[in-house]
Amino acid sequence: MENSLNYQPVADRYERMPYKYCGKSGLQLPLISLGLWHNFGSVDNFDVATDMIKYAFDHGITHFDLANNYGPVPGSAESNFGRILRENFQGYRDEMIISSKAGHEMWAGPYGGNSSRKNLMASIDQSLRRTGLEYFDIFYSHRYDGVTPVEETVRTLIDIVKQGKALYIGISKYPPEQARIAYEMMAKAGAPCLISQYRYSMFDRAVEAESLPLAAEYAVSYTHLTLPTILRV
C-alpha cells in the first residue's frame, strides 16, 4: 500500500468524471458515487479500504455514502472512513461530499432504530463523532419505519440543517405516500429534499411506477441502491 503521508491525488481527477446538478440546488454530484455499505467495516482489510477510497477520488468520485449501521460491525464503516480522511485526505474535505443516514437498528432498546426525533438526533451526533467531521454534506432518514409520523421525521431533518450538522437532507426507501409528505414539508420549510435513494436495478424496477415520477415532479434527484451508485436527475 502507498504510504499515506506520500499520497497526492492525481491532478486530472476532475477530467475523469461527469458531474450533474442535484435537485433544486447548486450542488453537483459525480455520476458515480461510492457507497460504503460493505468492504469498509471492522471485519475488512483497512489497507484495501483505504486504497479503494484513494482510487475513487483519483477518478473523480467525490461523493462517499455512509450510514450509521454500515460495517460490519455497525458504526465501523464511519469510524474507518474518518480514519482514512485523517490519515490521507487532510486538506481535501472541501472537495468531498460525505453523506450518512440513520433509521435502521443501531443500538439496543426502543430508541436505537427508528425514524423518531430521539433516534435521529442521537444518531447524527454519534456519526459525527465517529467520522471526526463537523458536518455531513447530506444526511438522510434511512427509512420510513411505518410508525413514526413523517412530519416528526421531517421536522427533525430540517432542524439538523438549521443546527449546521448537515448542509442538505434526503430520504431513503420511502413509499410514495410518505415521500410526497416529506417533499411538501421540506419545500415549504425552505429546505427542499435534495435527493432520494431507492432500490432500483434491472431485477427490481418497482419504483418506476410511482416513486421516480414523484421525485421528478418535485425536482428531487435520486440514486440507485446498487453497486455502484448512479445519480439521476
Positions of the model-derived regions?
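N-terminal binding-site loop/beta-alpha segment at the start of enzyme catalytic domains
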Residues: 1-96
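Conserved, mostly hydrophobic/aromatic
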Residues: 22, 34, 64, 81, ...
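Short, well-ordered coil/turn segments that N-cap beta-strands
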Residues: 28-32, 60-62, 92-96, 133-137, ...
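Glycine/proline-rich, positively charged
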Residues: 54, 105-210
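Hydrophobic packing residues within well-ordered alpha-helices of enzyme cores
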Residues: 81, 179-182, 215, 233
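Histidine/acidic residue-rich metal-binding segments in metalloenzymes
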Residues: 207-219
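Conserved small/polar residues in nucleotide/adenosyl-binding loops
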Residues: 223-229
